[in-house]
Amino acid sequence: TSLTDSQLEQLLKSSEGWFAAVYLNLCSFSKSGELPGKTSDIYQMFSASMLNPLPEDRKEFLSAMGLADEFTEEMAEFITKREDVHQILKMLTRQNAFVTCLNDGQTYRFHHMMKECAFRAFRTLDDSRQAFYYERYGAWYEKHGAYIHALSAYRRNQNFAAILRVVQKDAGILLASLKPEEVLEVLNRCPVSVLKEYPLAILVLMR
């Protein structure tokens, strides 16, 4: 069965030009007669061929960094506390393993299929490991003034003191985009003892 023009366009878009992604998409197409969507088993196929064979520590590295849309070597070192990040990224990009270095020569990005599979693998980590990485992401983004990203990471980790600290630092500038229900959720779930430590943050949230 040949692909239609619309299917070819879909394949090009979903594969982002990665040969391995094209191959996995076509394998799925040969079995079902349809190109895979987000609900298909192509992600299981991808994980089985690209993630599962890796050593656990390498798999965890990819799982953790899959949370970021883009990242630098410095960021990956901070998030994972690994000293061999340079070697890992060099190996992955050399093998064309769904990780690419952008034109600036410093920023890396996962293919969307790798990112989705990495996130699925991340959710299988112990709660303590997930909490560790969310805390590291929050700290990185907070340090670099990316307060919306920091807030998102801290919320996933339920670190309410860090949430209010970020709100107080931002003074409502970037976080003005928060929906009212999100603000109420933070206030309702935050322990009173923590709220008392950050009165200025409460004023910012109640604007």
Stretches with model-predicted labels:
Residues F29, T80, F122-D126:
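Active-site catalytic pocket residues across diverse enzymes, especially alpha/beta-hydrolases
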Residues Q44-A121, F132:
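C-terminal boundary/linker of central alpha/beta nucleotide-binding cores
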Residues S128-R207:
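Extended alpha-helical scaffolding segments used for macromolecular assembly and cargo binding
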Residues S2-F46, P53-E60, G66-E73, K81-R82:
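Amphipathic alpha-helical "lid/sensor" segments that cap RecA-like P-loop NTPase cores
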Residues Q10, S14, L24-S28, A64-M65, ...:
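Short acidic/histidine-centered micro-motifs embedded in hydrophobic/aromatic stretches
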Residues S2-L3, G37-D41, N52-P53, R109, ...:
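Short helix-capping and inter-helix turn/linker motifs at the boundaries of alpha-helical repeat units
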